[in-house]
Structure formats: structure tokens, C-alpha cells
Amino acid sequence: MLKGIKKLFKRSEEVNAKKDVVNIVEPYKVKINTGLLPVRKGPSAEYDVVGAVKENNTFVIVEEVINKNGEVWGLLKAFRKERNGWINLKYTQKK
């Protein structure tokens, strides 16, 4: 019985380790601190680029995700005509 429980627990850990973790946050501002930062369709470099934001510009983040690679990504509020996009928060400074 104990072996079965250990197997089930291990399988659950493996599945959970591959999921993104969503953090609902109060909207906050970030300043871009790299030359040109790609904006993507989802919270990972694996997603298509939908645009880019320039250094020193400020944007509002409305949601955070820690992806399966451990990177923290932020969802931009109303990026380019009401379309939201994701940026890697590693290249930003919280204001």
C-alpha cells in the first residue's frame, strides 16, 4: 500500500512541476531596462512574438506567471490596441 501511495505522490509531483504557476497580483508598473524586449503571446520564449517594447518605457503588469523553466513573466495591460502580451520580468525594474 505504501509503495502505491509513494508512486502516486511522485507522479503528482512530476505533473505539477511541468505546469505554470499563475500569481494574481495588484496591477503594478515596471520600467523596461534592456534595449528592445520582445512581447509574446504567452509566458515563455516558446511563444510567438507579437511586438516589442523599448528601454525606459513604463508599462502596467496585471498578472504574473512562473513558467515551467522558473522564469517570471508579466502580462502587459492593453498592449497595442487592447491586445495583451507577455514580457520576461527579468528585464524590468518594478516602479
Language-model-detected regions and their locations in the chain:
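Extracellular/lumenal glycan-associated surfaces
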Residues: 37, 41, 79
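SH3-family beta-barrel domains
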Residues: 1-38, 51-55, 64-65, 93-95
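Short alpha-helix capping/helix-loop boundary micro-motifs
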Residues: 43-48
